[in-house]
Swiss-Prot record:
Family: Belongs to the herpesviridae glycoprotein C family.
Span of domain Ig-like: 250-348
Lineage: Viruses, Duplodnaviria, Heunggongvirae, Peploviricota, Herviviricetes
Bilayer topology: Single-pass membrane protein
Any one of the GO CC terms: virion membrane
Glycan attachment sites: 92, 112, 204, 346, 392
Amino acid composition bias (Polar residues), ranges on this chain: 60-69
Family matches, as Pfam families: Marek_A (PF02124)
Gene3D superfamilies: Immunoglobulins
Species of provenance: Meleagrid herpesvirus 1 (strain H2) (MeHV-1)
Keyword Transmembrane: yes
Cellular compartments annotated: Virion membrane
Protein name: Envelope glycoprotein C homolog
Transmembrane segments: 456-486
Length: 489
């Protein structure tokens, strides 16, 4: 009886040890599995473009490790605390934060060209399907500019020009140009792209890249793209902004320097036509090769935008004129800059200087005679009677000689018959051909043909004759008396 009890105890002890050995071997086999059994590979994509009509593309093959992981988990008994911690750490390491890495944050595209954006998608979904149904949204936010040169200049100095949210650029309504969805089965879907073939969105499933092409870029395509990766609950996981800067070099640069009179200040305007964006042009001035600085109280600049042509800038400057020196060479230097691109151009003009003529008007022998000194060639005379232009009044204008004080200037004389209308008439001699106001150089006088004016000279003459006769008569009488009286005595 006692021996039987001892045998039972030995068997029981051996049985528990066997069970313990079996469990230990099973635990050891589970712990010896590789750590990557429960880890999905990075999404394997086949290179095919996303269609714009919403048709699903080729599916992503399911990872074969999923089935293996499920089988192992089924065969595994209740894990120990150590194995649970190891599995949890492994699962946490699989939760890599997704990211979008683009080749550039700013893309400069010239007008009518194609703009391209290329980004890498770093997406490594864990075994649970938290990110297995992700979404990729591409939104375009256009940027327009205020047509206010003061704002543009202040923003350019502050470095804020073109920054969304600033006072110098304001976005129009955002436009969702593509929304790409991945369902749990691995199929990709995309929403139709707006504006026809304007945008082309693609995903390379092998290289894990996505791209956006903007074809035939115009001014409305200036703005920034938002590329947002969302989870299955539509929560944003990562967001990137890529700016598309539409560029256009100035089409032409011209300097206009209007003619001036001697002693008056020179004025010049620099016109920079058809560039983009506003604020990308810098203007500087030169006078005979030396730097000239515009004055804020009388000089400035302004710009406007022409649809389909771009911006045009006009900058003005005022320069002193002593009247003793030759007209200066006024130059405008223009630098257009966008990113690392720089384009320069310049234009030069020399203003023409005119000198004040001397005009005198007199009446003689039934004519109004105008005498002009020191005028350039091409200047003629127009007569006005009571401020009414008279026809055919330039034929009787002749050159009387050369100006003695100004080279290549000459003297003129012109006349017109006075009207015998027994009235007081205004005659005006006006110089035509100067690039100034038409009444800038003229002289006016009145000719009095009234009866009182005509009779006055005759009365004066008769009075003078009678006075002279009376004076002579009195003289003769006095002389006669002088001779007569002494003889009588």
């Amino acid at each position: 009886m006692v021996s039987n009890m001892r045998v039972l105890r030995v068997l029981r002890l051996t049985g528990w040890v066997g069970i313990f050995l079996v469990l230990s071997l099973q635990q050891t086999s589970c712990a010896g599995l590789p750590h990557n059994v429960d880890t999905h590979h990075i999404l394997t994509f086949n290179p095919s473009p996303i269609s714009a009509d919403g048709v699903p593309l080729s599916e992503v093959p399911n990872s074969p490790t999923t089935e293996l992981s499920t089988t192992v988990a089924t065969k595994t008994a209740v894990p120990t605390t150590e194995s649970t911690s190891s599995s949890e750490a492994h699962r946490n390491s699989s939760h890599k934060i997704p990211d979008i890495i683009c080749d550039r944050e700013e893309v400069f595209v010239f007008l009518n060209n194609t703009g391209r954006i290329l980004c890498d998608l770093i997406v490594d979904p864990p075994s649970d399907d938290e990110w297995s149904n992700f979404a990729l949204d591409v939104t375009f936010n256009p940027i327009e500019y205020h047509a206010n040169e003061k704002n543009v200049e202040v923003a350019r100095v502050a470095g804020l020009y073109g920054v969304p949210g600033s006072d110098y650029a304001y976005p129009r309504k955002s436009e969702l140009i593509s929304s790409i969805r991945r369902d749990p089965q691995g199929s990709f879907w995309t929403s139709p792209t707006p504006r026809g073939n304007k945008y082309f969105i693609w995903i390379n499933k092998t290289m894990h890249t996505m791209g956006v092409e903007v074809r035939n870029v115009d001014y409305k395509d200036n703005g920034y793209f938002q590329v947002i990766l969302r989870d299955r609950f539509n929560r944003p996981l990562v967001e990137k902004h890529i700016y598309m800067r539409v560029c256009q070099r100035p089409a032409s640069v011209d300097v206009l320097a209007p003619p001036v009179l001697s002693g008056e200040n020179y004025k010049a305007s620099c016109i920079v036509r058809h560039f983009y964006p506003p604020g990308s042009v810098y203007v500087s001035w030169r006078r005979n090769g030396n730097i000239a600085t515009p004055r804020k109280d009388r000089d400035g600049s302004f710009w406007w935008f022409e649809s389909g042509r771009g911006a045009t800038l006009v900058s003005t400057i005022t320069l002193g004129n002593s009247g003793l020196e030759s007209p200066p060479k006024v130059s405008c230097l223009v630098a257009w800059r966008q990113g690392d691109m720089i384009s320069t151009s310049n234009a030069t003009a020399v203003p023409t200087v005119y000198y004040h003529p001397r005009i005198s008007l007199a009446f003689k022998d039934g004519y109004a005679i105008c005498t002009i000194e020191c005028v350039p060639s091409g200047i003629t005379v127009r007569w006005l009677v009571h401020d009414e232009p008279q026809p055919n009044t330039t034929y009787d204008t002749v050159v009387t000689g050369l100006c003695r004080t100004i080279d290549r200037y000459r003297n003129l004389a012109s006349r017109i018959p006075v009207q015998d209308n027994w009235a007081k008439t205004k005659y005006t001699c006006r110089l035509i051909g100067y690039p100034f106001d038409v009444d800038r150089f003229q002289n006016s006088e009145y000719y009095d043909a009234t009866p009182s004016a005509r009779g006055m000279p005759m009365i004066v003459t008769i009075t003078a004759v009678l006075g002279l006769a009376l004076f002579l008569g009195i003289g003769i009488i006095i002389t006669a008396l002088c001779f007569y009286l002494p003889g009588r005595n």
